[in-house]
Amino acid sequence: MREYAVFTSESVSEGHPDKMADQISDAILDAILKEDPYARVACETLVKTGAVVLAGEITTTANIDVEAVVRQTVNGIGYHHSDLGFDGSTCAVINMIGKQSPEIAQGVDRQKPEDQGAGDQGLMFGYASRETDVLMPAPISYAHRLMERQAELRRSGALPWLRPDAKSQVTFAYENGKPVRLDAVVLSTQHDPEITQTQLKEAVIEEIIKPIIPAEMFHAATKFHINPTGMFVIGGPVGDCGLTGRKIIVDTYGGMARHGGGAFSGKDPSKVDRSAAYAGRYVAKNIVAAGLADKCEIQVSYAIGVAEPTSISINTFGTAKVSDELIIQLVREHFDLRPFGITRMLNLIQPMYKQTAAYGHFGREGSDTAFTWEKTDKVEALKDAAGL
């Protein structure tokens, strides 16, 4: 497979309307899981001028104040005043959530938890590479960090004219499959009307971009496109409608790896769209961290109501130190990829999903209760089994 000469990935801020929708959906999921760990949740959100619309299917014993969760989330993102075009305290909240079909439940639920079937058919991918210290592709990793930096400076008041909505796009040049220089950065950020474009561009380059991207990656021809359309005062849900699940490439690997098509936010762990994609990252990251390959993509697939994956495939892009067949064998031996096995292996029945809903689901610090799929606790077992 020919390597890319350049590669580009984008990210968006927590104040981007699609990410607002993701965070609201996951905040509702978290609130439900706090009271009912085994709830079935599929929560979709739409945000547009003055309104948040909720829809989906939820089956739970939890009794939560959905409207309060929505308002707290919107205000927490930074849309807390009408001057910003959206106010979490006064926006309309329209709730159209129903119950999950019993036909789905009968296909998923089992007497023995380990026999729990997949919540739907589908295919999911996981990926890892040695491009960065978090074993993620460089373009998406740095695009996320730029958006985190924008939010940090906005929240701290260091750049008080910043507003919540923003986007980044990063292009790296590659040689021999490794990023060697920064070709271009695009960064658009919502702002107060008083700031001049000259002030904004200087601040974005000096305070957001340069502290994040390593100095050695810049070169004389690096291009900076800062708010290239000029003014960006009208943003968030006023500028664009936001929907849950519309940033699936931002959420994963920035286009560097394939995607099965299923979104994450608003879905409980019984939905393999989410849990199996997390497991795929866990598997791929441990394979790369163990030195079995420098780059790894895994595909898993499921049938609704069936526990065992219908397929497991591995692609190491010619970087493996052992055969791909052996790696697949080790995956089957060391990782339980049944839906219940994934939930248990990664401790997924936790109210921790809202923090995944902005700045990427992968390549972030792992802990006992969040981003557990970033752990590399299978490394020694894989090394020993592979004879490395």
Curated annotation (Swiss-Prot):
Catalytic activity reported: L-methionine + ATP + H2O = S-adenosyl-L-methionine + phosphate + diphosphate
Location of the region described as Flexible loop in the Swiss-Prot/TrEMBL record = 100-110
* The protein's annotated pathway: Amino-acid biosynthesis; S-adenosyl-L-methionine biosynthesis; S-adenosyl-L-methionine from L-methionine: step 1/1
What processes in GO biological process is this protein linked to? one-carbon metabolic process; S-adenosylmethionine biosynthetic process
Source organism superkingdom? Bacteria
Note how many cofactor molecules are bound and how.
Answer: Binds 2 divalent ions per subunit. Binds 1 potassium ion per subunit.
**Binding annotation for Mg(2+):** 18
Q: Which Pfam families has this protein been placed in? A: S-AdoMet_synt_C, S-AdoMet_synt_M, S-AdoMet_synt_N
As for subcellular location, the record says: Cytoplasm
Cofactor(s) essential for the protein: Mg(2+); K(+)
UniProt keyword terms in alphabetical order: ATP-binding, Cytoplasm, Magnesium, Metal-binding, Nucleotide-binding, One-carbon metabolism, Potassium, Transferase
Q: Name the InterPro entries on file.
A: ADOMET_SYNTHASE_CS, S-AdoMet_synt_C, S-AdoMet_synt_central, S-AdoMet_synt_N, S-AdoMet_synthetase, S-AdoMet_synthetase_sfam
Keyword Zinc-finger attributed = no
NCBIfam families, per the entry: metK (TIGR01034)
**Biological function:** Catalyzes the formation of S-adenosylmethionine (AdoMet) from methionine and ATP. The overall synthetic reaction is composed of two sequential steps, AdoMet formation and the subsequent tripolyphosphate hydrolysis which occurs prior to release of AdoMet from the enzyme.
Name of the protein described by the UniProt record? S-adenosylmethionine synthase
Q: Which organism is it from?
A: Acinetobacter baumannii (strain ATCC 17978 / DSM 105126 / CIP 53.77 / LMG 1025 / NCDC KC755 / 5377)
